[in-house]
């Protein structure tokens, strides 16, 4: 593991900058793994096979579906902030849309009424609109491989 302490940096860099700052800056930009530090000790790292790191793998979701979920969550957050804006202590409840998707419509309504029970404003319009939006929203499917 690289150390950023001045005692461990003994050789000056050719461009005259402090090598400790370079090491610290480089380690702050990306995470290093054991394969990265091992490949740095070899002069030609291009010939060493690198294993795929799990953080580099990507998963494809349906972008339209993700966009609908994002818009729905933003709408819910905005509505909840509006409902609780008159409250002295800001304690906005969290509404888990995925958990609501698992429930029946009546259970969803009961759950939302319980969550929004201490709201200073009327919540019936918000609850009915959220329930109608949930019917249109599909659960996020498993990622495509």
Swiss-Prot record:
Biased composition (Basic and acidic residues): 37-47
Low complexity composition-biased segments: 1-14
Protein name stated in the entry: Protein phosphatase 1 regulatory subunit 14D
Summary of the tissues where the protein is detected: Detected in colon, intestine, kidney and brain cortex.
The keyword Phosphoprotein appears for this protein: yes
Chain intervals for the UniProt region annotation (Disordered): 1-59
Gene3D superfamilies noted in UniProt: CPI-17 (1.10.150.220)
UniProt PTM comment: Phosphorylated on several residues.
Species the sequence originates in: Homo sapiens
Record gene name: PPP1R14D
Pfam family membership, one: PP1_inhibitor
Region (Interaction with protein phosphatase 1): 21-25
Family according to the record: Belongs to the PP1 inhibitor family.
Annotated localization: Cytoplasm
GO cellular component: a single term: cytoplasm
InterPro entries xrefs: CPI-17 (IPR008025), CPI-17_sf (IPR036658)
Composition skew (Basic residues), residue ranges: 21-32
